[in-house]
Structure formats: C-alpha cells, structure tokens
A protein has these predicted regions:
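N-terminal beta-alpha lobe that positions the nucleotide/phosphoryl donor
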Residues: 1-154
Length: 154
C-alpha cells in the first residue's frame, strides 16, 4: 500500500498551534501555519519558522475568515486542516465545508455531524443521560430567569 503524504494547515494560534506543529513534526508531516500581522512574533510563528521555514507561514487578516483559511489551504497544497480548539473546532459548518467542497480536505477532529449534535450543551446532556452516562445536576432546558437559575444551582 502506498503511503500518502499529507500537509496540515494549522488554523489556530498560540500554544495549541505550537503543539500541533510539534506533533506534525514528530509524525513526519508537513505543515503550514496561519498568523495575523499582530501575531508575527508569537510562539507558534517562531516554531513554525524554525521547523518549517518561511514557506510554512501564511499571513491572514483573521483567524475567523473561513474563505481566507481555505484559500491558504489551497495555495499551500494542504491536504488537511487542524482547527485546534475554539475558532473552527466547534463550527460544524466549517468542518462540513472542509470535507465536502470540490477540493476535499481532511478535517482533523470530530465529523461535522458530531460537532453539530454535540455543540448544543443541552442536547449533549440529554443524549448522555439517554445512554446512561452520568451528568452533573442541573437543567435539561434553557433557563432565562435569574431566580430559576439560582433555584437550580442550590
């Protein structure tokens, strides 16, 4: 079986991006990192430059711009996107777009369906209970009244 070479686009910043870059290096995977102008001297940019050189860095205007992130993925020849946490890690629409567009990429994380289903904490709690998984005490529905929230908290 032929080994597929992958290049991972790291779509995050800070410590999580540093860890993803280090993991890619350890696994022998190529990587590219995005960064904003404000983050040019941050840790993830320094380590990406150190381990991958200038070609591993792409400046973006925002970590939240899906179009720009996907454009960088295409320009860099990335085959996968690692969202880290926050930003796109919890956005099922982004994960779905990554994996269903014409130039499909691997989304490193849960499937978009899982993100969609478990992204709502109330639905997640209901699902856990239905499967017999213990949950913390509290409400199974949204609380809009401060007095009710205090009552449940006691």
């Amino acid at each position: 079986m032929e080994k597929t070479e992958h290049k991972v686009l790291v779509a995050n910043r800070g410590e999580i991006a540093v860890r993803i870059v280090q993991a890619c290096r350890k696994l022998g995977l190529e990587f590219v990192c995005v960064h904003t102008a404000e983050d040019i001297h941050s840790g993830h940019v320094r380590i990406a430059k150190e381990l991958g050189g200038e070609k591993s860095l792409y400046q973006v205007s925002s970590y939240h711009d899906a179009n720009e992130i996907l454009s960088v993925a295409d320009d860099a020849g990335a085959t996968a996107i690692h969202p880290g946490y926050g930003f796109f890690a919890e956005d099922f629409r982004f994960a779905r777009r990554v994996t269903t567009r014409e130039r499909k990429l691997i989304f490193i994380g849960p499937s978009w369906r899982v993100i969609r289903e478990l992204g709502d904490k109330i639905n997640t709690k209901r699902l856990a209970r239905s499967l017999g998984v213990p949950t913390v005490p509290g409400s199974d529905r949204p609380i809009y009244d401060e007095m009710e929230a205090e009552k449940i908290a006691r």
